[in-house]
């Protein structure tokens, strides 16, 4: 990974995998991606942000969504050339230039770089408008099966009514 980014090649190697990545702070407040490694079918995934993550900037969340893709799919992406479609131009710049002025985002980028290097993935990002990004759907998807009570509310119920005999969505 590093040797490919130290000097710029005149021609890039052909893309062998494509991913659309997105993060959202509205609706489902989560992240999502669509990954295709031909000849396989497209693989979608999504999740919701933690409370701590929701305190972060949308730029950070977009970068974190890329890391979530790599954490889940890096073994399948080993030795591939990955084209990342990103609807955030700042994050696209950060991924392509491997630098950020934000220490927090630079730390997140380092974690991404570790995964890319470990699995020998060559990645580059391109911009796509949000309206055209299929991952936008997954980042806003509300998973109705993934509900839970706030921990403080669950404790209040247990304190008031005693030990539970049924599941409290946890």
Predicted regions and their residues:
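RNase H catalytic domain
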Residues: 70-142
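Beta-sheet entry/capping signal
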Residues: 16-18, 30, 41, 80-83, ...
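Short conserved beta-strand segments at catalytic cores or DNA/RNA-binding microdomains
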Residues: 22, 32-41, 86
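A short, polar/acidic, helix/strand-boundary loop motif
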Residues: 36-64, 72, 90-103
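Flexible, low-complexity interdomain linkers flanking nucleic-acid-processing modules
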Residues: 121, 138-170
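Two-metal-ion RNase H-like nuclease active-site motif
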Residues: 12-26
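Short, flexible loop/turn motifs enriched in small residues
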Residues: 24-31, 78
């Amino acid at each position: 990974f590093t040797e490919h980014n130290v000097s710029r090649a005149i021609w890039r190697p052909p893309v062998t995998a494509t991913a659309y990545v997105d993060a959202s702070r509205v609706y489902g407040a989560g992240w999502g991606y669509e990954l295709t490694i031909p000849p396989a079918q497209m693989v979608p995934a999504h999740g919701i942000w933690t409370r701590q993550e929701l305190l972060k900037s949308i730029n950070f969340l977009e970068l974190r969504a890329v890391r979530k893709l790599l954490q889940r799919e890096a073994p399948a992406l080993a030795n591939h050339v990955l084209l990342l479609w990103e609807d955030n131009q700042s994050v696209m710049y950060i991924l392509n230039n491997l630098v950020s002025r934000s220490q927090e985002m630079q730390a997140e980028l380092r974690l991404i770089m570790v995964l890319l290097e470990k699995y020998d993935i060559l990645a580059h990002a391109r911009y796509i408008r949000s309206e055209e990004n299929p991952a936008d759907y997954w980042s806003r998807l509300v998973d109705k099966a993934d509900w839970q009570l706030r921990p403080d509310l669950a404790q209040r119920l247990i304190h008031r009514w005693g030990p539970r005999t049924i599941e409290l969505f946890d």
